[in-house]
């Protein structure tokens, strides 16, 4: 049996990565998928603690030990790209203790538009930016925006407040990414969240139902 599929989520500080996970996991859980979360940050495990409280302790969607925080102590992308050994070791331990797992979601610490995940760590890569950064963001390019499997543009409700044109962002994303998919989401209102979960099921899990190994 191969390893459990792994989805990496990267993006700048404050883009909404943790909230995306908090919104997507309930959709996956409602469809019967067993999910684990590994949340990286430089010096804190606060995001992991919040997700554990919200998803495990309060709602019982997964066991508490399936939400793990990793304080990397260094540059965020190092722990998910150049040297992912710490994350790999943690995930292998989780997999050994939970043979029912269908998916592991790995959150990178907030970083810049060059963030990517090592293929040794993640099988599918979601990169998230947000409208508050301005409508220039997609056309800046960068490895994260250009090469990810799915680009998400969050906080669509803030466009008018920051003078961002969603039409410009859409056109630039289409030009920069070509045939690679992207989508607009609003994690506060769940706009686009079901579609993200369906992308994960179709593309990362290859449509496999819960309890069935991929491949």
Curated annotation (Swiss-Prot):
Q: Name one GO biological process term.
A: urea catabolic process
List of residues binding GTP: 11-18
Query: What SUPFAM superfamilies does the annotation carry?
Result: P-loop containing nucleoside triphosphate hydrolases (SSF52540)
Question: What name has this protein been given in UniProt?
Answer: Urease accessory protein UreG
Query: What GO molecular function annotations does the UniProt record carry, in alphabetical order?
Result: GTP binding; GTPase activity; nickel cation binding
Q: Which organism is it from?
A: Cenarchaeum symbiosum (strain A)
- Which proteins does it associate with, and in what oligomeric form? Homodimer. UreD, UreF and UreG form a complex that acts as a GTP-hydrolysis-dependent molecular chaperone, activating the urease apoprotein by helping to assemble the nickel containing metallocenter of UreC. The UreE protein probably delivers the nickel.
Instruction: Give one Pfam family, short name only.
Output: cobW
Q: Does the keyword Flavoprotein apply?
A: no
Query: InterPro entries from the entry?
Result: CobW/HypB/UreG_nucleotide-bd, P-loop_NTPase, UreG
Protein's UniProt keywords contain Nucleotide-binding: yes
Q: What is the predominant subcellular site recorded for this chain?
A: cytoplasm
Function according to Swiss-Prot or TrEMBL: Facilitates the functional incorporation of the urease nickel metallocenter. This process requires GTP hydrolysis, probably effectuated by UreG.
Q: Where in the cell is it found?
A: Cytoplasm
Cross-referenced PANTHER family, in alphabetical order?
A: UREASE ACCESSORY PROTEIN G
Which cellular components does GO assign to this protein? cytoplasm
Assigned keywords, A-Z: Chaperone, Cytoplasm, GTP-binding, Nickel insertion, Nucleotide-binding
NCBIfam families tied to this protein: ureG
Q: Which domain of life is it from?
A: Archaea
Q: Which family, according to the similarity comment?
A: Belongs to the SIMIBI class G3E GTPase family. UreG subfamily.
């Amino acid at each position: 049996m191969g390893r459990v599929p792994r989805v990496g989520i990267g993006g700048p500080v404050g883009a909404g990565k943790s909230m995306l996970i908090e919104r997507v996991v309930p959709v996956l859980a409602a469809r019967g998928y067993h999910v684990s979360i590994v949340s990286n940050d430089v010096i804190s495990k606060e995001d992991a603690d919040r997700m554990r409280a919200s998803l495990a302790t309060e709602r019982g969607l997964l066991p508490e030990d399936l939400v793990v925080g990793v304080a990397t102590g260094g540059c965020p992308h190092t722990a998910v790209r150049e040297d992912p050994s710490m994350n790999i070791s943690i995930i292998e331990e989780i997999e050994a203790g939970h043979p029912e797992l269908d998916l592991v979601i790995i959150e990178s610490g907030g970083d810049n538009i060059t963030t990517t995940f090592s293929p040794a760590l993640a099988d599918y890569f979601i990169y998230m930016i947000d409208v508050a950064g301005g409508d220039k963001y997609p056309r800046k390019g960068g490895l994260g925006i250009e090469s990810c499997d799915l680009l998400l543009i969050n906080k669509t409700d803030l466009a008018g407040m920051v003078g961002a044109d969603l039409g410009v962002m859409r056109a630039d994303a289409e030009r920069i990414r070509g045939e690679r998919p992207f989508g607009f989401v609003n994690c506060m209102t769940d706009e686009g969240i079901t579609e993200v979960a369906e992308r994960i099921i179709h593309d990362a899990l290859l449509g496999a139902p819960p309890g069935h190994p991929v491949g």
